[in-house]
UniProtKB/Swiss-Prot annotation:
Belongs to the short-chain dehydrogenases/reductases (SDR) family. Keywords: NADP, Oxidoreductase. This is Short-chain dehydrogenase/reductase GME11361. Its EC number is 1.1.1.-. The keyword Membrane does not apply.
């Protein structure tokens, strides 16, 4: 059992998500947990479970500063909050893509900066959930080297498919239809199915199982610099050591892009 004095703050803890699952898993491991979200009403079940909840809009510097000032000490920061956007590059709304980058990259770094004084004092840890956030993965490598002299560990959390509200929220908050003039018109149905992640919706690791595994990894005496958890995460890890492009056919079959390719070619 981890000492109750250890504290963790997790961003993006709305109910049904991976952040909420992490909050529960950390509490069960003996941590004092600060669960945060932009809308505190979406963390009601966590409050009922005895988990402390704080308001945090990661896109607001004022909100970040207020949240950081309300925490007296911190051992682990988990940058979990983020968003997703599925659209072929040819049809992508660049302004929307820039907003996504603000959420998934710059906001994460702003949160890390705000809580860094606490983490340096405790010689703590920063962990960033990384699915499609490739830029954050690169920044994690930089932070790991830069913060090592201060005793702060930086862990890159690479996650496969997890059964959570992420895909559901994506369908609600982001466009899932191609524009009328898309070059993918001959394969519209197949492309939009891939954008909705139809083939991936029911194959994810249960969020509570994923969270327990991640907490177990992070609380090891010497946690790995990169943690691979979630369905198909091992496949992603294997792909990093294979020749570039070797996994293309597997990824196409997993996502439905093989069907897209067939329809575009025969059009």
């Amino acid at each position: 059992m981890v000492s109750a004095k250890k504290t963790v703050l997790i961003t993006g803890c709305s109910e049904g998500g991976m952040g909420a699952a992490l909050a529960v898993a950390f509490k069960e491991a003996g941590f004092r947990v600060y669960a945060t979200a932009r809308d505190p009403s979406k963390m009601a079940s966590l409050s009922r479970a005895g988990i402390e909840t704080l308001t945090l809009d990661i896109l607001s510097s004022e909100s970040i500063a207020t949240c950081a000032s309300s925490v007296s000490s911190l051992d682990i920061l988990v940058n979990n909050a983020g968003s997703s956007y599925s659209m072929p590059v040819a049809d992508m709304d660049i302004n929307y893509a820039k907003q996504l980058f603000d959420v998934n990259v710059w906001a994460q770094l702003a949160v890390s900066q705000a809580f860094l004084p606490h983490l340096i004092k405790s010689k703590g840890m920063i962990s960033a959930y990384n699915a499609s956030k490739a830029a954050i993965s690169m920044f994690s490598d930089c932070q790991r080297l830069e913060l090592e002299p201060f005793g702060v560990k930086v862990i890159d959390l690479k996650t496969g498919a997890v059964a959570s509200n992420l895909i559901k929220n994506q369908k609600t908050l982001t466009p899932i239809t191609l524009p009328r003039d898309s070059i993918y018109e001959p394969a519209r149905d197949a492309v939009e199915a891939a954008m909705r992640n139809d083939k991936m919706a029911d194959v994810g690791t249960p969020a509570n199982q994923w969270a327990k595994e991640v907490v177990g990894d992070l609380t090891r005496k010497s946690p790995p610099l990169v943690i691979w958890r979630g369905a198909n995460a091992k496949l992603g890890r294997f792909g990093t050591i294979m020749p570039h492009g070797m996994m293309d056919s597997t990824i196409k079959k997993m996502t439905g892009l093989d069907v897209v390719e067939q329809k575009v070619r025969v059009a």
